[in-house]
Swiss-Prot record:
This is (R)-1-hydroxy-2-aminoethylphosphonate ammonia-lyase. PROSITE patterns: AA_TRANSFER_CLASS_3. Gene3D superfamilies: Aspartate Aminotransferase, domain 1, Type I PLP-dependent aspartate aminotransferase-like (Major domain). The keyword Lyase applies. Its EC number is 4.3.1.33. It is an enzyme of class 4 (lyase). Its cofactor is pyridoxal 5'-phosphate.
Length: 479
């Protein structure tokens, strides 16, 4: 095969790492099925006015409304949103958040730099309270990518080292500094030289990792994604120390506590070893909890499920309650040493509206006991998905935490060959039946519902999903 022919194949593989590919024949067939004239007209207007980019063009459908766990298109069709770009922890249009933001807009809609305001201070105080431990210093920013940049700056300042270790297949945002430390080729494609001093190591992947697991997966149960004490993946952490010692000058290690897109859940032992290594070598541990924070794991923040504390925590997306973009970097008082450095300096740094939304989000999670609810829902989802795994041979692995689950489809359980076509077929079958989710790595179905979802809604969604899996198994002759 020539290099020319290889390039499209490589690009398709790269783009599958983050989400479902929107230029496949299956997507074209889906777009053709949208036979509403108003929908097609809107899609054309969108295509004519916006810059086209990978994974966003062409659009899947048009939306006119969103409420609770549902998004609604121009024809009135509703989708249960199990994707939501991870801003939908509390679903859409939560009345408490709308009320608090509306009140804030009427009194103080914006706070210029050099001034502070009661809402921002209250929000920061509440945030440090739920973080607990030594995470007691906060900076706000308009979005998650921005706080990643702030964290990298702070780590350089504190350690006086500019080098960073990250994980292959990681995603930390789409700005130049964020794609520099990210591990997905699709975002670096054609961008030329990026930020210097980035080393990458393999992530602790339980099902098809770069290194074999040292202990039998049976020790971790049928679900390869239990956040437990099993030490079968600790050698992935040991490789971090190898790189730190060989490379030298490492200032930070950045990672998600749980990889969001294809739901990779390391063991507690892995994260405890990472924490030990960072402490030993004076490397700052940056946890990117932008997609999973605010309760998705069943804890306020995902690292809390692993009994560790980072030096810097980055959050965003769902922090604004699905209403207002806001993100935060939380760190320790001992790192409050950058008074002469502009770590953020963002126009909307102490946004009263953003902080009102974030404060209301934290209040809803507490008032509605969503952390406890997520833990109960997690056990239910695990049981249902494991039953499907036993029945349908296309399912190779089930892994998850809280209300974040990955279902990996394979054509063969021995070779673990990725079932690309089958995963796409499941996606569009579910979309037809009103269930929306993303597909990562080309074959991992990510199920990420709003935390407010009722048990009945959860049962309906899983029923739709199972019927799609059953149909694909029949159509592709697995059964």
């Amino acid at each position: 095969m020539t290099t020319t022919n290889q390039e499209p194949i490589l690009k398709a593989t790269h783009f599958r790492s983050e989400g479902d590919v929107n230029t496949t024949p299956a997507r074209e067939k889906w777009n053709e099925s949208l036979n509403d004239d108003a929908t097609q007209a809107m899609l054309k207007r969108d295509s004519d006015v916006f810059l086209h980019q990978a994974m966003s063009t062409p659009c899947l459908d048009t939306l006119t409304a969103a409420e609770g766990i549902y998004i609604q298109d121009a024809t009135g069709k509703k989708y249960m949103d199990f994707h939501g770009n991870n801003v939908h922890q509390l679903g859409y249009g939560h009345p408490h958040i709308i009320n608090k933001v509306t009140q804030q807009m009427a009194s103080l809609p914006f706070s210029p730099r050099r001034f502070t305001n009661e809402t921002a201070v209250q929000c920061a105080e509440k945030l440090t309270q739920i973080c607990g431990g030594d995470l007691n210093r906060v900076l706000f920013a308009p979005g998650g990518t921005s706080v990643i940049g702030m964290a990298l700056k702070l780590a350089r300042h504190v350690t006086n080292n500019f080098k960073v270790v990250s994980l292959w297949d990681s995603f930390h945002g789409a700005s130049l500094d964020a794609i520099s430390v990210g591990g997905e080729a699709c975002f670096r494609e054609g961008m030329g030289p990026l930020m210097a001093g980035v080393e990458r190591i393999p992530p602790a992947v339980s099902y098809r990792g770069a290194f074999p697991l040292r202990d039998s997966l049976s020790l971790r149960g049928q679900n390869s994604g239990d956040a437990n004490e099993t030490a079968c993946d600790v050698h992935y952490a040991d490789y971090l120390e190898y790189v730190i010692e060989k490379e030298g000058g490492i200032g930070a290690f950045i990672a998600e506590a749980v990889r969001n897109t294809d739901v990779q859940v390391p063991s507690k032992a892995y994260w405890k070893r990472i924490r030990e290594i960072c402490d030993k070598h004076n490397v700052m541990l940056i946890i990117d909890d932008i997609p999973n924070g605010m309760g998705r794991s069943g804890e306020w923040f995902t690292h809390q499920a692993f009994d560790i504390e980072p030096d810097i925590l980055c959050i965003g997306k769902g922090f604004g309650g699905g209403l207002v973009p806001i993100a935060a970097m939380i760190t320790k008082d001992k790192y409050n040493t950058a008074a002469q450095v502009s770590l953020g300096h963002y126009t909307h740094e102490k946004s009263p509206i953003g902080c009102a939304a974030a404060l209301a989000t934290m209040e809803v999670i507490e008032q509605e006991n969503l952390l406890e609810k997520v833990q109960a829902d997690s056990a239910f989802v695990r049981e249902q998905l494991l039953q499907m795994k036993e029945e349908y041979p296309v399912i190779g692995d089930i892994r998850g935490i809280g209300l974040l689950w990955g279902v990996e489809l394979v054509t063969d359980h021995i070779t673990k060959t990725r079932a690309f076509d089958e995963a796409e077929a499941v996606l569009y079958q579910c979309l037809n039946e009103g269930l929306s989710f993303k597909v990562s790595q080309g074959n991992v179905i990510q199920l990420s519902p709003p935390l407010i979802i009722s048990r009945n809604e959860l049962e309906v969604a899983l029923s739709v999903f199972e019927k799609a899996i059953a149909k694909v198994c029949k159509d592709f002759e697995y059964l």
